[in-house]
């Protein structure tokens, strides 16, 4: 499937061009754009550029100017959701030799009569335009207005749904000499008798949800009987009416004998027996729409055979429904509701189904019932190991839409819960590209407004992972939001008072650890909100929980790195607590305790406000503790950069401080050389290590580890060459 393949070079180029037009254009006197390069684009490329601009919502008065001349020759034009005037439309598009135009949902400044008037100004378009889509537009701002559809004599396909389109307009359309396909869904038509005028040419008729229709069932059937060429008929509805039209139609054996496709989804009184009999009288039939009816449950109508079925009885029918009804919110919701029921237990990933859910979500971003059902389906389709079988690009699309749903419905608890359940996936959080900064903010906002314990655990788990993936700048920006630190500290306070060690506490500590990393503002928020006192309480409450101690000390390391907060840590009780943990048998605990001491001691005697004898004792203990550490079997810590270590490397008067810094560097460079050797070289670590190697008074233990690091760096350079400029992501 396409989601598992990289984008084509053309797609990447057109996406960039469509979103950075200002770099490739000059401005005319009227402010519109004109491409700088005079090269002529191939017609297919021009069509795709226009479509890319439409998808990216980049079509406006200024940007459509690039289509005025002959550099970009259009044939199939998509201007969906464009924000343009009638004048801009005429200048940009009406000189092209168009055979198709999709103007769905263009802004209210341009009407259907404006569009047809512009198109009709070209003799070529009048005679050759074949397909015109004018859904969700205003017909005219004038009353009365001149009906003008008949001017487009070459038109074969017309879609004019969700429009105040009346019987007289239908009569005008029915006079088109080549009209083969017509969609008048959700219009104001009350009488379809005018369609008899095109009975000998009309092959496809879609009239979904004709809510204003005032004809009797018999009268409707009489018109349909006349449409002898019809091979597609859509009479579906949103279950709002009790009309017996579907039931009566299925009883007719002598009409629609050439029918290939019939859609009666949402209609009443439909049975499997009647549908099956209707199809058997028309063996050429290929599709029947039965969603939101009582039919579709027989083996004959399963959708697995020659006849495709949109329905709710099985996943095949539901997939067909999602494909065909992606722009009909009611049917999308119905299909998703039944999909959720059928996907509680899945043993195999289904990317095709997830793609259909994505399309439904994207087409109806502000429809709560759709988003609610879709987010629930996303969870079923991606939970546990199922996400591993999904293409990354597809998961990226899903994640973006989940975040959009959270933004649109911030106060709907069930929808927020659905989205969090789906986001709480290692595959998504670790491997999928999406805006992690926005996601972290959204989840934090949810966390601050809800107290559901199960959801709280998920939220802090998500935040702890997201925070580790952010850049230093993003982490600082996120941590600068005071409410975030305050809320996380409140969770820690609650768990500590309950004497409870659980995953929520661990994830919350990890989140705070990651948020304070190389972020002085967040560290200050931590101190100002009594974080230090709280964390000392945590250490006292859980004296035998090494995993808790490690996270607490890791965060306190981040605080100790901030020079401006040095005095906040110059507290005897605090130093005594850290000194005890320096002697922990757990190397991970001792390591972080040593880091705190190293940073505090490194700033010199003049900044040490406690007793000098304590400082000397700590330095001795620091040195001996480091030398006692066994080599860890795995990487026990991760760093964004080595910048916090560099000041420590210059502390020749306190070799214990240097020793901790080089031990840390050696540890990560030996466990993950590709990442950390490159980082150390890139950040200028070689020069600093050379200074230690060449210093006459370098401590032997420090010198030994320094030489080991330099040897590792030398091997790395020989194997990989100079490191790239881009840094790898950070995780903790």
UniProtKB/Swiss-Prot annotation:
> For this UniProt entry, which segments traverse the membrane?
none
Q: Which GO terms describe its cellular component?
A: Cul2-RING ubiquitin ligase complex
Q: Which InterPro entries match?
A: ARM-like, ARM-type_fold, LRR_dom_sf, ZER1-like_C, Zyg-11_UBL_adapter
What Pfam family is a match, any one? ZER1-like_2nd
Q: Could you tell me which residues the LRR repeats occupy?
A: 128-149, 154-177, 178-199, 209-231
Question: Does the record carry Repeat as a key word?
Answer: yes
Print the keywords alphabetically. Answer: Leucine-rich repeat, Repeat, Ubl conjugation pathway
**Record's PANTHER family?**
PTHR12904, ZYG-11 FAMILY MEMBER B, CELL CYCLE REGULATOR (PTHR12904:SF22)
Q: Which family does it belong to?
A: Belongs to the zyg-11 family.
Q: What does this protein do?
A: Serves as substrate adapter subunit in an E3 ubiquitin ligase complex zyg11-cul2-elongin BC. Targets substrates bearing N-terminal glycine degrons for proteasomal degradation.
Per its record, how is this protein called by name?
Protein zyg-11 homolog
Organism encoding this protein: Xenopus laevis
């Amino acid at each position: 499937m396409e989601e598992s393949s990289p984008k084509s070079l053309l797609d990447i180029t057109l996406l960039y061009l469509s979103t950075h037009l200002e770099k490739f254009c000059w401005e005319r006197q009227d402010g519109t754009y004109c491409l700088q390069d005079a090269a002529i684009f191939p017609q297919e490329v021009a069509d795709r550029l226009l479509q890319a601009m439409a998808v990216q919502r980049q079509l406006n008065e200024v940007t459509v100017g690039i289509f005025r001349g002959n550099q970009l020759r259009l044939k199939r034009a998509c201007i969906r959701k464009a924000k343009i005037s009638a004048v801009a439309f005429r200048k940009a598009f009406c000189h092209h030799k168009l055979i198709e135009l999709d103007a769905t949902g263009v802004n209210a400044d341009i009407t259907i009569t404006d569009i047809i008037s512009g198109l009709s100004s070209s003799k070529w378009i009048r005679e050759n335009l074949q397909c015109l889509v004018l859904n969700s537009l205003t017909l005219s701002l004038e009353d009365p207005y001149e009906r003008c559809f008949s001017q487009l004599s070459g038109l074969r396909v017309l879609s004019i749904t969700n429009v105040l389109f009346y019987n007289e307009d239908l009569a005008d359309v029915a006079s088109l000499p080549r009209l083969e396909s017509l969609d008048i869904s959700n219009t104001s038509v009350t009488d379809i008798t005018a369609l008899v005028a095109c009975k000998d040419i009309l092959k496809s008729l879609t009239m979904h949800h004709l809510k204003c229709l005032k004809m009797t069932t018999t009268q409707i059937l009489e018109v349909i009987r006349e449409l002898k060429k019809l091979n597609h008929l859509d009479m579906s509805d949103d279950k709002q009416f009790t009309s017996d039209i579907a039931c009566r139609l299925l009883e007719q054996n002598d009409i629609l004998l050439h029918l290939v496709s019939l859609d009666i989804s949402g209609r009443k009184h439909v049975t499997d027996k009647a549908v099956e009999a209707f199809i058997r009288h028309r063996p050429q039939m290929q599709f029947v729409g039965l969603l939101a009816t009582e039919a579709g449950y027989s083996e004959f109508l399963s959708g697995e055979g020659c006849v495709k079925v949109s329905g709710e009885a099985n996943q095949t029918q539901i997939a067909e429904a999602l494909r065909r009804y992606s722009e009909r919110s009611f049917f999308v919701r119905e299909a998703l509701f039944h999909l959720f029921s059928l996907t509680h237990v899945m043993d195999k990933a289904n990317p095709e189904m997830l793609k259909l859910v994505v399309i439904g979500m994207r087409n109806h971003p502000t429809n709560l019932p759709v988003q609610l059902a879709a987010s629930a389906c996303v969870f079923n389709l991606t939970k546990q190991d199922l996400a591993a079988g999904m293409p990354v690009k597809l998961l990226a699309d899903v994640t973006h839409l989940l975040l959009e749903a959270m933004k649109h419905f911030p106060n709907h608890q069930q929808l927020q819960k659905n989205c969090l359940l789906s986001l709480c996936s290692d595959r998504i959080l670790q491997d999928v590209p999406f805006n992690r900064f926005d996601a972290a903010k959204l989840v934090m906002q949810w966390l601050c407004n809800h107290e559901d314990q199960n959801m709280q655990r998920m939220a802090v788990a998500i935040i702890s992972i997201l925070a580790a993936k952010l850049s230093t700048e993003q982490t600082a920006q996120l941590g600068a939001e005071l409410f975030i630190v305050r809320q996380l500290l409140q969770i820690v306070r609650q768990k500590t008072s309950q004497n409870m060690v659980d995953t929520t506490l661990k994830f919350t500590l990890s989140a705070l650890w990651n948020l304070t990393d190389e972020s002085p503002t967040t560290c200050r928020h931590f101190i100002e909100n009594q974080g230090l006192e709280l964390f000392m309480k945590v250490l006292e409450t859980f004296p035998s929980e090494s995993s808790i101690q490690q996270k607490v000390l890791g965060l306190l390391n981040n605080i100790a790195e901030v020079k401006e907060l040095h005095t906040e840590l110059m507290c005897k009780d605090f130093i005594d607590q850290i000194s005890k943990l320096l002697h922990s048998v757990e190397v991970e605990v001792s390591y972080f305790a040593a880091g705190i001491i190293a940073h505090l001691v490194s700033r010199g005697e003049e900044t040490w406000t406690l007793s000098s004898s304590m400082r000397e004792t700590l330095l001795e203990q620091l040195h001996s503790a480091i030398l006692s550490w066994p080599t860890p079997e795995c990487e026990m810590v991760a760093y964004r950069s080595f910048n916090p270590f560099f000041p420590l490397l210059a502390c020749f008067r306190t070799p214990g401080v240097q020793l901790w810094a080089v031990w840390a560097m050696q540890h990560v460079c030996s466990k993950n050389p590709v990442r950390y050797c490159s980082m150390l070289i890139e950040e200028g670590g070689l020069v600093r290590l050379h200074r230690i190697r060449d210093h006459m008074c370098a401590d032997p233990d420090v010198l030994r580890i320094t030489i080991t690091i330099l040897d590792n760096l030398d091997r790395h350079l020989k194997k990989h060459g100079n490191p790239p400029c881009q840094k790898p992501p950070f995780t903790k």
